[in-house]
């Protein structure tokens, strides 16, 4: 479960909309920052190919910018709406994978 689920939705929305959030200035979405867990690896495996390619490109650009100690021009920052949609999609897939893993564990017991 994501930490975002524990926080009030209004706080999460205001956090994602604020311009001081550095990940947006590098073109990343919030879900791009998730730790690489076993469940997330399965989620990435299930993503459509074009979505996965876009995510990989965002990560490569962010790594390059980080090494150069630069930020994107404001016109190229990540969009709030697309960020929210991508994060919701990843959360939905993650919940589904976790339910499947719980079901598998219950059959093993």
Swiss-Prot record:
SUPFAM superfamilies found in the cross-reference section: 14 kDa protein of cytochrome bc1 complex (Ubiquinol-cytochrome c reductase)
Domain of life: Eukaryota
Pfam families: UCR_14kD (PF02271)
Single GO biological process annotation from the record: mitochondrial electron transport, ubiquinol to cytochrome c
Compartment annotation: Mitochondrion inner membrane
InterPro entries cross-referenced by the UniProt entry: QCR7 (IPR003197), QCR7_sf (IPR036544)
Ranges in a coiled coil: none
Binding partners and assembly: Component of the ubiquinol-cytochrome c oxidoreductase (cytochrome b-c1 complex, complex III, CIII), a multisubunit enzyme composed of 3 respiratory subunits cytochrome b, cytochrome c1 and Rieske protein, 2 core protein subunits, and additional low-molecular weight protein subunits. The complex exists as an obligatory dimer and forms supercomplexes (SCs) in the inner mitochondrial membrane with cytochrome c oxidase (complex IV, CIV).
Sequence similarity: Belongs to the UQCRB/QCR7 family.
Role: Component of the ubiquinol-cytochrome c oxidoreductase, a multisubunit transmembrane complex that is part of the mitochondrial electron transport chain which drives oxidative phosphorylation.
Name of protein: Probable cytochrome b-c1 complex subunit 7
Organism: Dictyostelium discoideum (Social amoeba)
């Amino acid at each position: 479960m994501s930490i975002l689920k524990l926080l009030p939705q209004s706080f999460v929305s205001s956090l994602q909309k604020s311009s001081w959030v550095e990940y947006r200035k590098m073109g990343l979405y919030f879900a791009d920052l998730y730790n690489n867990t076993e469940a997330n690896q399965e989620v990435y495996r299930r993503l459509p190919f074009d979505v996965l390619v876009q995510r990989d490109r965002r990560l490569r650009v962010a790594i390059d910018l980080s090494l150069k100690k630069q930020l994107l021009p404001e016109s190229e920052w990540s969009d709030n709406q697309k960020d929210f949609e991508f994060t919701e999609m990843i959360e939905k897939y993650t919940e589904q994978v976790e339910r499947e893993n719980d079901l598998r564990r219950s059959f093993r017991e």
